[in-house]
Amino acid sequence: MQIILLEKVANLGNLGDIVKVKDGYARNFLIPNRKARRATKEAIAEFEVRRAELEKIAAEKLAASQAVGEKLNGQSFEITQKSGVDGRLFGSVTNGDVAELLKKAGYEVEKLQVRMPEGPLKMIGEHNVQVALHTDVVVDVTINVIGDHA
């Protein structure tokens, strides 16, 4: 399916690009999330009329994400979980737990924005986690997992 992108999409293209994607990806993700529209002649003409407005909105989102990223980058947060004497956690710290921790600290972060390269945290200690605030703004935070010996 040919679509026109209404915002920058990672690994796909930038605002205004006309790309071919699988039908399911377009119908189930891009179009419902208002990231794209079908590339009909009418949609392309309407996009060209609204291009400046959409570029302004995209620039505002990027600026807001960069401002939050500057505050968040390099910060350290602590989370306490039950653990055994060997330092392994009972359960794990997931991206949802990290997102909730960041929300409590005053940052508006969804769990899909939290990237954990090593997977869920299963040991006590300091771990680096990435937060993708925007496709162009990815910051590193440190999560210090403290063991609560049961």
Swiss-Prot record:
Keywords: Ribonucleoprotein, Ribosomal protein, RNA-binding, rRNA-binding. One of its GO terms (biological process) is translation. One of its GO terms (cellular component) is ribosome. It comes from the Bacteria. InterPro entries: Ribosomal_bL9 (IPR000244), Ribosomal_bL9/RNase_H1_N (IPR009027), Ribosomal_bL9_bac/chp (IPR020594), Ribosomal_bL9_C (IPR020069), Ribosomal_bL9_C_sf (IPR036791), Ribosomal_bL9_N (IPR020070), Ribosomal_bL9_N_sf (IPR036935). GO terms for molecular function: rRNA binding; structural constituent of ribosome. Belongs to the bacterial ribosomal protein bL9 family. Binds to the 23S rRNA. This is Large ribosomal subunit protein bL9. It comes from Burkholderia cenocepacia (strain HI2424). The lineage of its organism: Bacteria, Pseudomonadati, Pseudomonadota, Betaproteobacteria, Burkholderiales. The gene is rplI.
